[in-house]
């Protein structure tokens, strides 16, 4: 399609017609970290998402990008389990401390920060780093799992199933301090969190959700209410009439495994493509998205190259739809419409291709 730009000179002097974009300043942070759990391969998630075309997609949407690259986390050679169960606590603590500094820098610079994991233990660092400059933030946690076990209730010992327990102020009398975690300052309260997509919640986690009045929408609620009503209630709970930053923490296993097979803890009966993208489209429409985690893409767990690529492409769609990509196509936003050219300007006519 072509637009005649010469006509705009009649409306705006000699300034050519400009098709302005809805500009977001977006920081990209790769976090190739896997020690929040025991399966190899999730550290290759950032590379897979990059190879699936994330930066090009965001650029086409008009985003101004600052790429921090893929971080290199400090190795912790001696990292014994806590309580003979919780694995790699020092590695997780130090990696999140380093990640929090980068996210904090990005947010303080005016960027919406996209962090590509890596496992979901990284949300400790991204949320703390975000909260340093946006202390009134709220969290939308899209996941098959609640990730709110404590080190004393976990069965697996994996910290990627515990990150929120370290962040919620009201839980701190139930959470022991792990080695490497002394720097952590809890920054969330239950009214500031909403879960979407839950379908594998352990008994202690269910106890926490109920007794601390944390809002959640399981897949059963999504089936019953529909995703539109779920998002309306989410925004009513978190935002209401306030304008506050949103931190979206999105685990790719929120989707049904048929869509996202390359992940470490798949659970049947997950979000459809349409439901998942509707969530991010609606968050974008608020204009309040300030940080986004996309985690748990694990190319090594795919049974074929196509499965790995499909999961990474889905991750790109989640991120892109959070920054303006719609299922109608990514739109360039007009600041005005052109009018027919004057006869004497026709020979200088310029066309802009969209």
From Swiss-Prot:
<comment type="function">
    <text>May play a role in the regulation of extra-urea cycle arginine metabolism and also in down-regulation of nitric oxide synthesis. Extrahepatic arginase functions to regulate L-arginine bioavailability to nitric oxid synthase (NOS). Arginine metabolism is a critical regulator of innate and adaptive immune responses. Seems to be involved in negative regulation of the survival capacity of activated CD4(+) and CD8(+) T cells. May suppress inflammation-related signaling in asthmatic airway epithelium.</text>
</comment>
<dbReference type="GO" id="GO:0005739">
    <property type="term" value="C:mitochondrion"/>
</dbReference>
<feature type="binding site">
    <location>
        <position position="145"/>
    </location>
    <ligand>
        <name>Mn(2+) 2</name>
    </ligand>
</feature>
<feature type="binding site">
    <location>
        <position position="253"/>
    </location>
    <ligand>
        <name>Mn(2+) 2</name>
    </ligand>
</feature>
<feature type="binding site">
    <location>
        <position position="202"/>
    </location>
    <ligand>
        <name>substrate</name>
    </ligand>
</feature>
<feature type="binding site">
    <location>
        <position position="147"/>
    </location>
    <ligand>
        <name>Mn(2+) 1</name>
    </ligand>
</feature>
<dbReference type="Pfam" id="PF00491">
    <property type="entry name" value="Arginase"/>
</dbReference>
<dbReference type="GO" id="GO:0004053">
    <property type="term" value="F:arginase activity"/>
</dbReference>
<dbReference type="GO" id="GO:0032651">
    <property type="term" value="P:regulation of interleukin-1 beta production"/>
</dbReference>
<dbReference type="GO" id="GO:2000562">
    <property type="term" value="P:negative regulation of CD4-positive, alpha-beta T cell proliferation"/>
</dbReference>
<feature type="binding site">
    <location>
        <position position="265"/>
    </location>
    <ligand>
        <name>substrate</name>
    </ligand>
</feature>
<dbReference type="GO" id="GO:0071641">
    <property type="term" value="P:negative regulation of macrophage inflammatory protein 1 alpha production"/>
</dbReference>
<feature type="binding site">
    <location>
        <position position="143"/>
    </location>
    <ligand>
        <name>Mn(2+) 2</name>
    </ligand>
</feature>
<dbReference type="GO" id="GO:0045087">
    <property type="term" value="P:innate immune response"/>
</dbReference>
<keyword id="KW-0464">Manganese</keyword>
<keyword id="KW-0056">Arginine metabolism</keyword>
<feature type="transit peptide" description="Mitochondrion">
    <location>
        <begin position="1"/>
        <end position="22"/>
    </location>
</feature>
<feature type="binding site">
    <location>
        <position position="296"/>
    </location>
    <ligand>
        <name>substrate</name>
    </ligand>
</feature>
<dbReference type="GO" id="GO:0071650">
    <property type="term" value="P:negative regulation of chemokine (C-C motif) ligand 5 production"/>
</dbReference>
<feature type="binding site">
    <location>
        <position position="143"/>
    </location>
    <ligand>
        <name>Mn(2+) 1</name>
    </ligand>
</feature>
<dbReference type="GO" id="GO:2000774">
    <property type="term" value="P:positive regulation of cellular senescence"/>
</dbReference>
<feature type="binding site">
    <location>
        <position position="251"/>
    </location>
    <ligand>
        <name>Mn(2+) 1</name>
    </ligand>
</feature>
<keyword id="KW-0479">Metal-binding</keyword>
<comment type="similarity">
    <text>Belongs to the arginase family.</text>
</comment>
<keyword id="KW-0496">Mitochondrion</keyword>
<dbReference type="GO" id="GO:0000050">
    <property type="term" value="P:urea cycle"/>
</dbReference>
<dbReference type="GO" id="GO:0006941">
    <property type="term" value="P:striated muscle contraction"/>
</dbReference>
<dbReference type="InterPro" id="IPR006035">
    <property type="entry name" value="Ureohydrolase"/>
</dbReference>
<dbReference type="GO" id="GO:0071644">
    <property type="term" value="P:negative regulation of chemokine (C-C motif) ligand 4 production"/>
</dbReference>
<dbReference type="GO" id="GO:0032720">
    <property type="term" value="P:negative regulation of tumor necrosis factor production"/>
</dbReference>
<keyword id="KW-0378">Hydrolase</keyword>
<keyword id="KW-0399">Innate immunity</keyword>
<protein>
    <recommendedName>
        <fullName>Arginase-2, mitochondrial</fullName>
        <ecNumber>3.5.3.1</ecNumber>
    </recommendedName>
</protein>
<dbReference type="GO" id="GO:1905403">
    <property type="term" value="P:negative regulation of activated CD8-positive, alpha-beta T cell apoptotic process"/>
</dbReference>
<dbReference type="GO" id="GO:1900425">
    <property type="term" value="P:negative regulation of defense response to bacterium"/>
</dbReference>
<dbReference type="GO" id="GO:0006525">
    <property type="term" value="P:arginine metabolic process"/>
</dbReference>
<keyword id="KW-0391">Immunity</keyword>
<dbReference type="InterPro" id="IPR020855">
    <property type="entry name" value="Ureohydrolase_Mn_BS"/>
</dbReference>
<dbReference type="InterPro" id="IPR023696">
    <property type="entry name" value="Ureohydrolase_dom_sf"/>
</dbReference>
<keyword id="KW-0809">Transit peptide</keyword>
<dbReference type="GO" id="GO:0002829">
    <property type="term" value="P:negative regulation of type 2 immune response"/>
</dbReference>
<dbReference type="GO" id="GO:0032696">
    <property type="term" value="P:negative regulation of interleukin-13 production"/>
</dbReference>
């Amino acid at each position: 399609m072509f637009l005649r730009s010469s006509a705009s000179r009649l409306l705006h002097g000699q300034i050519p017609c400009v098709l302005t974009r809805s500009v977001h300043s977006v920081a990209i942070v790769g976090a190739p970290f896997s020690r929040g759990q025991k399966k190899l391969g999730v550290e290759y998630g950032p590379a897979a998402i990059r190879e699936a075309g994330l930066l090009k997609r965001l650029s086409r949407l008009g985003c101004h990008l600052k790429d921090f690259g893929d971080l290199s986390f400090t190795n912790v050679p001696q990292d014994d389990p806590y309580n003979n169960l919780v694995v790699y606590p020092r590695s997780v603590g130090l990696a999140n401390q380093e990640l929090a500094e980068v996210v904090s820098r990005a947010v303080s610079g005016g960027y919406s920060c996209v962090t590509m994991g890596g496992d979901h233990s990284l949300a400790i660092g991204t949320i703390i780093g975000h909260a340093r400059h946006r202390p009134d933030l709220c969290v939308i946690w899209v996941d098959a799992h609640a990730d709110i076990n404590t080190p004393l209730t976990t069965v697996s010992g994996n910290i990627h199933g515990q990150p929120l327990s370290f962040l919620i102020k009201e839980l701190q009398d139930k959470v022991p301090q792990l080695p490497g975690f002394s720097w952590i300052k809890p920054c969330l309260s239950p009214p500031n969190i909403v879960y979407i997509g839950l379908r594998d919640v352990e008994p202690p986690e269910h106890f926490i959700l109920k007794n601390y009045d944390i809002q959640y929408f399981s897949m059963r609620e999504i089936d019953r209410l529909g995703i539109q009503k779920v998002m309306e209630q989410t925004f009513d709970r978190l935002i209401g009439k306030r304008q506050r930053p949103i931190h979206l923490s999105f685990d790719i296993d929120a989707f049904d495994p048929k869509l996202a097979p390359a992940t470490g803890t798949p659970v049947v009966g997950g979000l459809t493509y349409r439901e998942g993208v509707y969530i991010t489209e609606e968050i974008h429409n608020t204009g309040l998205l300030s940080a986004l985690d996309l985690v748990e893409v694990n190319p090594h767990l795919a049974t074929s190259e196509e499965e790995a690529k499909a999961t990474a492409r889905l991750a790109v769609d989640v991120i892109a739809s959070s920054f303006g990509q719609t299922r109608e196509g990514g739109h360039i936003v007009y600041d005005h419409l052109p009018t027919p050219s004057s006869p004497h300007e026709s020979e200088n006519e310029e066309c802009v291709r969209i």
